[in-house]
Amino acid sequence: MDIEMIRGIPIEEILSRLGHEPVRRHGDECWYLSPCREERTPSFHVNTRKGVWHDFGTGHGGDIFTLAGEISESDGFMAQARFIAGVYGGT
């Protein structure tokens, strides 16, 4: 699986494969309980059209790679790419 293929994976697909489903949807907007920390009120936002996320509880956000870094606690781009490929089932 190359970087462009990984970049094309929808964030919501990775979240689903990790066991996280949206609490609320409205058009291109999805709200989740944060996959990175415990919370009771959904503050984790995904814009499905733009392919970006923002956690209003922490102020962090970005693309699928930064999300992989948050979840896997990795700053390295290749480690993030491997994490995504592993979750998605690619090699």
Which residue ranges define each predicted feature?
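N-terminal structured subdomain of primase-like DNA metabolism proteins
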Residues: 1-91
